[in-house]
């Protein structure tokens, strides 16, 4: 079973790491090509393109300039411990055991606008480049055109290597659009998380993101190997709703959270 998640905008390069192990990303030369395109942008261009503040734009102009094709523990850190958004709050990677980190290294992948696809222990230099960014590049006018079938082909290799025919999609729509379902040699299962608010169950972004991380953690800790076992997910009060689920979409609900 292979899991894909989105990356995060918030990064952490300060917290002590729970492991000294690391690996290298698979698409460094492709990332370098994107960096080359990014270096043509001024901070003003970046602010407009990414819809970010001047401060964040300036920070990322510096990051693009300092980015190197040599990844070391001095200029990078394993991706799983560098991302700090809502998904990663739920995943809580720093509390995983060594054997759980090893399992994640085989079964968890992070989609990325700059790096394409990252393994948990892949060294990652800090960046901001969301998959939906309309960045002109040598392969097209956006990152979906840039990555083409590369990410899907890599996922197929990973699935074949572990003898799995199931991909669990815990990524956002923006990121999963970088995967080509028709070319993927696996069944795609997408968990959906709905929270009750004012008597209605709906997808609430903040809760849904955290729930995706909780589900990834649940799979890693329990070494889940089939879809049936996913249905027993019950972290933070979520429960499986058979009547609203299909073979490809698993619906989980949760009662209203006290404020």
Swiss-Prot record:
Its domain of life reads: Bacteria
Q: Which Pfam families match?
A: H2O2_YaaD (PF03883)
A GO cellular component annotation here is: cytosol
Supply the InterPro entries for this chain: YaaA
Q: Which GO terms describe its biological process?
A: response to hydroperoxide
HAMAP family in UniProt: UPF0246
Q: What is this protein called?
A: UPF0246 protein VF_2109
Source organism per UniProt: Aliivibrio fischeri (strain ATCC 700601 / ES114)
């Amino acid at each position: 079973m292979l899991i894909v998640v989105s990356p995060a905008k918030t990064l952490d390069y300060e917290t002590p790491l729970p492991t000294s192990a690391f690996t290298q990303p698979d698409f460094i030369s492709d990332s370098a090509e994107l960096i080359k395109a990014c270096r043509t942008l001024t901070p003003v261009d970046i602010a407009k393109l990414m819809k970010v503040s001047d401060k964040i734009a300036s920070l990322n102009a510096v990051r693009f300039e300092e980015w190197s094709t040599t990844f070391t523990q001095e200029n990078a850190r394993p991706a799983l411990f560098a991302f700090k958004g809502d998904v990663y709050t739920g995943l809580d990677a720093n509390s995983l055991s060594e054997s759980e980190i090893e399992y994640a290294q085989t079964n968890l992948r992070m989609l990325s606008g700059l790096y394409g696809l990252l393994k948990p222990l892949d060294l990652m230099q800090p960046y901001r480049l969301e998959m939906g960014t309309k960045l002109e590049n040598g392969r097209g006018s956006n990152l979906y055109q840039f990555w083409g079938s590369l990410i899907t082909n890599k996922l197929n290799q990973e699935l074949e290597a572990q003898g799995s025919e199931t991909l669990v999609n815990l990524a956002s729509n923006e990121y999963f659009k970088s995967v080509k379902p028709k070319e993927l040699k696996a069944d795609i299962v997408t968990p959906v998380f709905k929270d009750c608010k004012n008597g209605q169950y709906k997808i609430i972004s903040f809760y849904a993101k955290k729930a995706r991380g909780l589900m990834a953690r649940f799979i890693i800790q329990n070494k889940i190997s089939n879809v049936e076992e996913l249905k027993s997910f019950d972290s933070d009060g979520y429960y499986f709703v058979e009547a609203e689920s299909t073979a490809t979409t698993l619906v989980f609900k949760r009662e209203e959270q006290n404020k």
